[in-house]
Amino acid sequence: MDNTIPGGINITILIPNLMIIIFGLVGLTGNGIVFWLLGFCLHRNAFSVYILNLALADFFFLLGHIIDSILLLLNVFYPITFLLCFYTIMMVLYIAGLSMLSAISTERCLSVLCPIWYHCHRPEHTSTVMCAVIWVLSLLICILNSYFCGFLNTQYKNENGCLALNFFTAAYLMFLFVVLCLSSLALVARLFCGTGQIKLTRLYVTIILSILVFLLCGLPFGIHWFLLFKIKDDFHVFDLGFYLASVVLTAINSCANPIIYFFVGSFRHRLKHQTLKMVLQNALQDTPETAKIMVEMSRSKSEP
């Protein structure tokens, strides 16, 4: 059976790439709005700094995949060097996004398990410093990997260095996955099974939903890229169907976070009285709903 359409494009390639473009455009809009609001319109706190950087990583990650899908559908051919540089940039953004999500989960877990230490001894600019370290480390890992594996300089390839860096990159990703899963489980266990009662806030829901979506949609891309793709000796030999499916899922993951913020922030609120700024502020709210209602009632009573 012929799976091509007029123009010579295989339908098994056309449909996933169209989905990547559609989800990518939705994600670009959502992450762009989140970045604008957190960067220029809202007061930033410890967690909003991470979310701002996560939105930035997702924005450029989606932009790269949209460009790649458009070039593929238009049958634009480009040098292998361009392709390898593109995948290096995508690697930086993927590692940075995963690191941001792991940092968010870990910080939230520490704030719940060690509240006194967290509120009294945590340095003021920890989030900003951590985000800077994450970006630098992600960039350094990927540049070194590309250099020693001959991506940036095809005339130079160090087999031992390439193998060592591939192993380190895979180990670092596994470490991030483990930290993300353990901190999330500890957070959920403390919320629902702990001795002291901790009331659920919108920030908890936002973080838990973002992590759940990543584990379902973002994880397959990392597994394919760093466990299957790196094992193969030939760059061109890999399962195209699984690769495209993992890219579609990771596009869904990158565009899901703004939707989660909108859903959590607007839940039980009348949308006609809510601006996007207020919705995002509600999604990052770290006070129980009952406490917020009491504060609003006290304010309304004090007004003449």
From Swiss-Prot:
Chief localisation class: membrane
Function as written in the Swiss-Prot or TrEMBL entry: Orphan receptor activated by a subset of RFamide-family neuropeptides such as FLRF-amide and FMRF-amide. Mediates its action by association with G proteins that activate a phosphatidylinositol-calcium second messenger system. Its effect is mediated by G(q) and G(11) proteins. May regulate the function of nociceptive neurons by modulation of pain perception.
Membrane-side (Cytoplasmic) residue stretches: 39-53, 97-131, 188-206, 265-304
Entry coiled-coil feature ranges: none
Designated name of the protein: Mas-related G-protein coupled receptor member A1
One Pfam family here: 7tm_1
Keywords: Cell membrane, G-protein coupled receptor, Glycoprotein, Membrane, Receptor, Transducer, Transmembrane, Transmembrane helix
Record-annotated membrane-spanning stretches: 18-38, 54-74, 76-96, 132-152, 167-187, 207-227, 244-264
Organism: Mus musculus
Gene Ontology cellular-component annotations: membrane; plasma membrane
InterPro entries the record matches: GPCR_Rhodpsn, GPCR_Rhodpsn_7TM, MRGPCRA, MRGPCRFAMILY
Chain ranges on the Extracellular side, renumbered to this chain: 1-17, 75, 153-166, 228-243
Statement: the UniProt record of this protein carries the keyword Glycoprotein: yes
Membrane topology of this protein: Multi-pass membrane protein
GO biological process, one term: sensory perception of itch
Known glycosylation sites: 10
Expression tissues: Expressed in a subset of sensory neurons that includes nociceptors. Expressed in the subclass of non-peptidergic sensory neurons that are IB4(+) and VR1(-).
Family assignment from sequence similarity: Belongs to the G-protein coupled receptor 1 family. Mas subfamily.
Gene label: Mrgpra1
